């Protein structure tokens, strides 16, 4: 993934690290995660760490999740892919965000259709 990202140009800096043990020396205005959190054993712990240690005051976390209970089309993914995936309900993800210390927490579904419940998007801000 890093090689692919670097080959697309730009001036980004990419590195490989364990998300659960990584300690950032910097804080950030915006952190975005897409299709990551449900692979973690304890996403609540990671989101709390991001809220407390990685975001600047006024910084925002935005997370996109396609594998969640209300999205029935995603229920077979774990078996098809052969990788453990955490299946939570929308309200459970919302509670994780609210209990992490983030404020102004919002959520919505993006790109829903007849056969797809949509990407669950959650966001919150550090005060």
Residue ranges: model-predicted function:
Residues 100-102, 106-127:
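Core SAM-dependent methyltransferase catalytic element
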Residues 65-85:
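Short, glycine-/aromatic-enriched active-site segment of Class I SAM-dependent methyltransferases
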Residues 58-66:
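Conserved beta-strand signature within the Rossmann-like core of class I S-adenosyl-L-methionine
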Residues 32:
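A conserved beta-strand element that flanks and buttresses the S-adenosyl-L-methionine
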Residues 5-6:
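Conserved SAM-binding loop
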Residues 39-50:
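A short, conserved alpha-helix within the catalytic core of class I
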Residues 84-101:
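Short alpha-helix
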Residues 9-21:
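Conserved SAM-binding strand-loop segment of SAM-dependent methyltransferases
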């Amino acid at each position: 993934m890093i090689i692919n990202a670097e080959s697309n140009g730009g001036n980004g800096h990419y590195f490989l690290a364990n998300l659960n043990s990584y300690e950032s020396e910097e804080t950030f205005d915006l952190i975005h995660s897409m299709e990551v959190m449900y692979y973690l054993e304890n996403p609540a712990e990671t989101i709390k760490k991001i809220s407390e240690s990685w975001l600047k005051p006024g910084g925002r976390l935005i997370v996109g999740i396609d594998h969640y209970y209300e999205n029935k089309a995603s229920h077979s993914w774990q078996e098809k892919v052969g990788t453990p995936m955490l299946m939570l309900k929308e309200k459970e993800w919302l509670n994780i965000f609210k209990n992490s210390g983030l404020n102004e927490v919002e959520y919505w579904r993006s790109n829903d259709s007849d056969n797809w419940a949509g990407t669950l998007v959650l966001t919150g801000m550090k005060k």
